[in-house]
Amino acid sequence: MTRALTKLEFSLYSLLHLKFGGREFSLDSARWYFSRPMLKKLVFKLSEAGWLKTKKRGVYACETPEKAVSGFFEPKAENALKKSNLSYCFTDASAAEIWSDQSYIQRSWEYSPFFIKVFRKDIKKWRAFLKQNGINFFEKEPANVVGEFIRLKPAEKMEIDEHNGFPVEPLHETIKFCEENKDTFEYVLAYIQNKYGKKTTASEEFLLKAREAI
């Protein structure tokens, strides 16, 4: 997983890539305008961020820009959530995906939100955990965001069901969400009505389409 660089880190990466390309280099050959302590610190951060490869002690090589940038879009949120040791459940559009058995998917590699409900008392723990794991997260609706991220939705209490191995809000809550956002989630409503026998306002056209997926 690649993380974004500071201006100074990116300047050093650019210099290293222009000078060495994919060739190996040592710290001594890259001292130019930086003191040795500062250079060691920056090189460590570049390596930790996924922009440099450590070949052996004190010897590095630049990761290609293409590979480094593609690292921004590597999926890791779901696996991290499983290791959080904190209570949560998928909600809203993420719950719609789960209850529809992924026949409806609202995510893509370039825009991949996960909506999770968490206990309000745990919000500081969630912030620390997600920062530690390098996962982008928001507590309000984000704007101008790409890639994978988690939208935290704090709650005083929550009911957690399980479906296909995922902790998810109860089906009736997902139906309510989909009804309130019917223009986007009518297919999910139709799937739910066909699969679980729950009455919804899905049209016959969508009911027929969803029936084919079950």
PLM region descriptions:
Residues 66, 120, 156:
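A broadly conserved detector of short glycine/acidic/proline-rich loop/turn motifs that flank catalytic sites
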Residues 128-214:
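Hydrophobic alpha-helical interaction segments
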Residues 1-90:
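Short beta-edge/loop segments at beta->alpha junctions of small alpha/beta modules
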